């Protein structure tokens, strides 16, 4: 499962296909670890050893070491406090992923996200939950991030794919692999060749975070080999992160329950719980508009 929203799809798979052989993944942390590697002068993010816990698009690094066991957190924290994830190569020639203006703002805003808990290093997506007022104020409803992606990355990728199909070859097609491709290839190699590498996966908690819902689909480091994955226990997590995660995982579980039961009430509750939405009345308005916009795709909600 390499989809978006991976968290909701992962929860749906857990509920509806509990015996399926599914690995749920997201590459956003990989891109951020590339940035952290550059902060520390390390060429390959795969040299980093780390502890991480959270939900998909909703997590924190609590420990980061190099391959010699040196603690990199002080150096990374110093950079985050000054610059967020901005590292000076956002507009570097040849760089194609996460170069849109919204991503530049997101990487810079990570400084403020980090300030909320300077003991951990946050995932960038937390800006939507911790600073929703900022996101609304700096967004253009007539040209959203979705429009930006469709006019940029999507147009380039789809155009390159059509060109490859027309030519019958990918040679000299100008289409280069990036973080998305490298991550899935590394994971496939680990499964096929039993490399026992460490990956961040979205898996049933079952004690990986002992003071959190055991049925939650959490994002934690796992060792991956030919027999699948083994979770690395992260230990109890702080109250702040635990509270945020409990609220967000309830959103995700209620969305899946709403789909299974065809329940308007539960989807309204899910949106009401989301920290991106200020009130139940706004949640209801959004839900009604979503139903109208997606009437050809959604089940009937009662």
Show where each model-derived region lies:
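Class I S-adenosyl-L-methionine
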Residues: 14, 34-38
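Conserved structured core elements
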Residues: 2-7, 26, 30, 181, ...
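Long, compositionally biased stretches enriched for glycine and/or charged residues
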Residues: 37-302
């Amino acid at each position: 499962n390499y989809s978006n929203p991976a968290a909701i799809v992962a929860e749906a798979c857990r509920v509806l296909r509990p015996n399926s052989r599914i690995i749920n993944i997201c590459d956003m942390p990989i891109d951020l670890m590339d940035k952290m590697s550059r902060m520390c002068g390390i060429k390959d993010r795969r040299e980093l050893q780390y502890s991480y816990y959270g939900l998909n698009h909703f997590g924190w690094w609590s420990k980061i070491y190099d391959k010699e066991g040196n603690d990199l957190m002080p150096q990374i924290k110093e950079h985050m406090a000054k610059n967020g994830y901005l590292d000076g190569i956002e507009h570097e020639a040849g760089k194609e992923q996460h170069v849109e203006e919204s991503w530049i703002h997101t990487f810079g805003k990570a400084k403020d996200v980090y300030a909320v808990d300077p003991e951990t290093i946050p995932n960038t997506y937390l800006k939507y939950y911790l600073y929703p007022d900022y996101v609304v104020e700096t967004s253009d409803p007539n040209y959203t991030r979705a429009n930006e992606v469709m006019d940029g990355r999507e147009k380039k990728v789809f155009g390159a794919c059509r060109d490859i199909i027309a030519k019958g070859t990918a040679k000299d097609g100008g289409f280069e692999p990036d973080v998305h491709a490298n991550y899935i290839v590394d994971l496939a190699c680990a499964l096929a060749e039993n490399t026992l590498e460490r990956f961040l996966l979205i898996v049933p908690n079952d004690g990986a975070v002992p003071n959190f819902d055991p049925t939650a689909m959490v994002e934690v480091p796992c060792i991956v080999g030919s027999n699948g994955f083994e979770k690395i226990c992260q230990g109890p997590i702080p109250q702040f992160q635990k509270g945020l995660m409990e609220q967000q995982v309830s959103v995700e579980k209620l969305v899946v329950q709403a789909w299974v039961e065809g329940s308007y009430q539960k989807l309204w509750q899910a949106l009401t719980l989301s920290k991106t939405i200020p009130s139940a009345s706004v949640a209801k308005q959004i839900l009604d508009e979503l139903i109208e916009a997606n009437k050809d795709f959604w089940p009937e909600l009662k």
